[in-house]
Amino acid sequence: WTTGTTYINNSGTVTVSALGADTQAVVINTLSTLATSAEIVNSGTIELKGGVTFSGDRSAISFITSGTSSVSIPLVFINTSTGVVKADSASYAVSLSAANTNTSAVQITNSGIISSDNFYAIVTRAGNDTYTQDAGSLMGSTYLGAGNDTFAATGGKIVGSVYLADGSDTATISNVDLSTIPTLDGGDDTLIADGFIDTLTLSNTSVATTELLNWEKIVLDATTFASPNNTLSTGTDVGYGLFLTNGSLLNAGTIFNLTGNLDIDSASIFQGYGAGSGVYGVSGSVTNAGTMTTQDGAAGDVITVGGDYTGVSGSTYKIDTVLGNDSSTTDNLVVEGNTSGTSTLIVRPAAGSPGAQTIEGIKVIDVAGTSGATFTLASAVQAGAYEYTLFKNGVTDPIDGDWYLRSTLIPVIPTDPATPIYRPGTSNYVSGQTANAEQGFLALGTLHER
């Protein structure tokens, strides 16, 4: 096999039991410069067992492209729906040999079972590698080496973590239970300055225990997310960060800190349930086209936005407020940058709201920068004998740009109307009309005279 495609098709059973550190059940060793690709198709069973000591060159299926004559060629493994690959605790299930000296791309398609008792089931080296799964299962972690790698799972089961190394990597996981995936790691960091941009998309699933690490951009599509450690880091540059789309829910619990930007589409929700002590932070900017809410029946939760806040028409911000005097407890939105756009404020009176006269008002939105957004109340806000309305700017500082609920109107001091300046003939014209009317009445005389 020195030219063209090296091809192996297994529909039977291949079982190798050996202690050797450099043992493979099925191996393709491509050394020729005339080789164009190497492909293994498995619809049967391939098993490597008997290993005791782990070695990076021990694998049930292995590609080797080493030597001075080696070239970068596609290395393809297809595991069909009936295919089974099993490896012991000293072995990988599928790997590109550590002796590889080039950037051959490993392309793995799995609809069957790939499993290893070792921590890693799949390991590749430098190259633009691909793993695709539409059914079946992957039992063991995956490491795709440096390069622009792609990991795509649209079905089946994954038990193990996914690690992608340096490069601009893409991972898409949909309709897969993430509870058995401890970590999804995009590689180097969350900065775009190095040219490596990693994107993770999670669709039709939920995140509760999975750590999401080193992704410049994370897109949640019809997905519920709750951080297992109350933090998440994403890209901080414009166009990167955490994106909630298609009815996704970010359940922020009682405390959550996002390093990066947050974008909420019209059907998605950022939700905090802090019971009055919730603390939530977004280090970057927030674009809200959907709903941000800390309504949980208790006032006092705080969302702090380190960058700008942009409200898209139709967006809402929901809070709990004790409706009383100026010192009343309320949920609060703090924006350290600028605000723009429009959002609707929905205020739910906290239990026991007495209603009282305010002076300055109850501050519900605190803007440090330019306050260019327009917030409007969704409906009447009432407690006791009082009704509260929403005002921009304070009383003592009428240009502070903050937003207040007030139960008193600030009177407008009337101004005297301007005095008009008439031309000289105007007074004669007006007095002449009066004189003519009087003369006419005098000419009528009395009834007796007539």
Question: What does each model-found stretch correspond to?
Answer:
Residues 1, 17-33, 50-74, 87-100, ...:
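Extracellular beta-strand/beta-solenoid scaffold signature
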Residues 5-17, 37-50, 74-86, 105-115, ...:
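Right-handed parallel beta-helix
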Residues 15, 412-450:
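Outer membrane beta-barrel translocator domains of Type V secretion systems
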Residues 23-26, 55-61, 91-94, 131, ...:
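Glycine-centered small-residue motifs that form tight turns
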Residues 34, 102, 125-127, 146-149, ...:
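Short, solvent-exposed linear patches
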Residues 35-37, 72-74, 102-103, 215, ...:
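A broad structural signal for short, well-ordered beta-strand segments within beta-sheet-rich domains
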Residues 100-102, 310-311:
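Alpha-helix capping and inter-helical loop/turn segments
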Residues 138-139, 148-152, 157-337, 341-342, ...:
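Extracellular beta-solenoid/beta-roll
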